[in-house]
């Protein structure tokens, strides 16, 4: 499916938090052709009450370039009218935002698929590394990638039915 080369695209890799409502407004304000805006917000979670913070490290130029590459693939696959991707780095506490994907399109299917595609690829391909900082003051280990994340990404590599 042809992407729209004039689609507004915003990619940010930063330490500062983001305002989800402001990002939705930025992509959709005064845009009457948009019929759907899908957002995904990834949060830092503490599954067992032991996590004080998650430290995200990255290669500055490489992270932005890889996310841009993934965004361009999404724009080629789905007819999007706007796309915003924000990924944070640094020390992030449980409950705080880590990543935001806002995908806008004329129809919901394209927006949902693009957001899902981008998250599946960012979980496995974006050059970010996570290390736990525990509530008792000790440094936890590096967080390994999960097999289910790899499986989710692989589904996008399978031949697609017409969309």
From Swiss-Prot:
Its EC number is 2.8.1.12. Pfam families: MoaE. GO terms for biological process: Mo-molybdopterin cofactor biosynthetic process. CDD domains: MoaE. Pathway: Cofactor biosynthesis; molybdopterin biosynthesis. Residues 138-163 are annotated as: Disordered. It catalyses: 2 [molybdopterin-synthase sulfur-carrier protein]-C-terminal-Gly-aminoethanethioate + cyclic pyranopterin phosphate + H2O = molybdopterin + 2 [molybdopterin-synthase sulfur-carrier protein]-C-terminal Gly-Gly + 2 H(+). It is an enzyme of class 2 (transferase). InterPro entries: MoaE_sf (IPR036563), Mopterin_biosynth_MoaE (IPR003448). Keywords: Molybdenum cofactor biosynthesis, Transferase. The keyword Transcription does not apply. Converts molybdopterin precursor Z into molybdopterin. This requires the incorporation of two sulfur atoms into precursor Z to generate a dithiolene group. The sulfur is provided by MoaD. Heterotetramer of 2 MoaD subunits and 2 MoaE subunits. Also stable as homodimer. The enzyme changes between these two forms during catalysis. This is Molybdopterin synthase catalytic subunit. It comes from Brucella melitensis biotype 1 (strain ATCC 23456 / CCUG 17765 / NCTC 10094 / 16M). The gene is moaE.
